[in-house]
Amino acid sequence: MQSMQPSTVDKLKMGAIMGSAAGLGIGFLFGGVAVLRYGPGPRGFLRTLGQYMLTSAATFGFFMSIGSVIRNEDIPLIQQSGSHWNQRLLNENANSSRIFALAMQQAKSSPRKSNEVAEC
């Protein structure tokens, strides 16, 4: 029996929550350092620190939500198309190896003089 996978909206919410939590922590650290270093300013300590934390949480949450949806979207389709690309890359690698081997054979069979200029 196959388990239910989260929907796209669930992935979006999960990414936003994780990003917001990380952003709050980073905002607390950087905001605390900024307040200690440059002073709280006219708004006071808590408002300045809170603004750092909320701005950082909103930014991290936004990008993490988008990233979590993009990262987890249609994994079976990506794997199928990936096998197509892997096969194509293997074929092109084999073709380039054959071309290189033929060029090396031709170079060995007809050596050039040292003062002859190669034409491209």
Curated annotation (Swiss-Prot):
Function: Required for cell viability in cells lacking mitochondrial DNA.
Transmembrane segments: 16-36, 50-70
Membrane topology (Extracellular): 37-49
Main location class: membrane
GO cellular component, one term: TIM23 mitochondrial import inner membrane translocase complex
Cellular location(s): Membrane
Membrane protein topology class: Multi-pass membrane protein
Entry keyword set: Membrane, Transmembrane, Transmembrane helix
Family membership: Belongs to the MGR2 family.
Gene Ontology biological-process annotations: protein import into mitochondrial matrix; protein insertion into mitochondrial inner membrane
Top-level taxon: Eukaryota
Organism: Schizosaccharomyces pombe (strain 972 / ATCC 24843) (Fission yeast)
Protein's name in the database: Protein mgr2
Cytoplasmic side: 1-15, 71-120
One Pfam assignment: Romo1
